Structure formats: C-alpha cells, structure tokens
Amino acid sequence: MRTLTLLTALLLLALHTQAKSPQGTAEEAPDQEQLVMEDQDISISFGGDKGTALQDADVKAGVTCYCRSTRCGFRERLSGACGYRGRIYRLCCR
C-alpha cells in the first residue's frame, strides 16, 4: 500500500512538473493538444537509500517507468496503471 501511494505521488509530481513547462500557446485547438499529449511518454525514475519504502517493496534502484497509451516496449513489463487528464494508461517499467 505504501508503494502504491509513493508511486502515485511520484507520478503526480512528474505530471505537475510537465504541466508547468511551456508547451505552446493557449490558442491551440483542443484536438491538436490531445494528440500531442498522447504521443508523449512520462518518465519516472526511482532511486534512493536502502531504507526507502520502494526498496522495502523489492523495487530496485534505477527502475524507470513510463505511462504509455500503447503496449509496453521491448524489455518493459506492465507494472500497473496511471491516470492523466481523466484517462487510464499502462505503467510500463524496465
């Protein structure tokens, strides 16, 4: 349960950081903006001390996860789900 909470917090932090970066003008058409957002991957990296909750849950340091709208890539495995703007995506980790 702690792992899920920590993963969710990291995902929300990554999404918040990405949302703050300027990605174009506000006059873009919503359909065009949606297409751009679907093509982008969100990278989440895990690391830290040996005493972290992620390490306690058998998650190794250096694991990188992506929130994907399509299937997981080569050498990635499905590790759960992530949500963005009301849509559910695959959480793929390597």
From Swiss-Prot:
GO cellular component, one term: secretory granule
GO biological process, one term: defense response to bacterium
Propeptide: 20-62
Stretch forming the signal peptide: 1-19
Function in brief: Active in vitro against S.aureus, fungi, Gram-positive and Gram-negative bacteria and to a lesser extent against an enveloped virus.
Family: Belongs to the alpha-defensin family.
Name used for this protein in its record: Neutrophil antibiotic peptide NP-2
Phylogenetic lineage: Eukaryota, Metazoa, Chordata, Craniata, Vertebrata
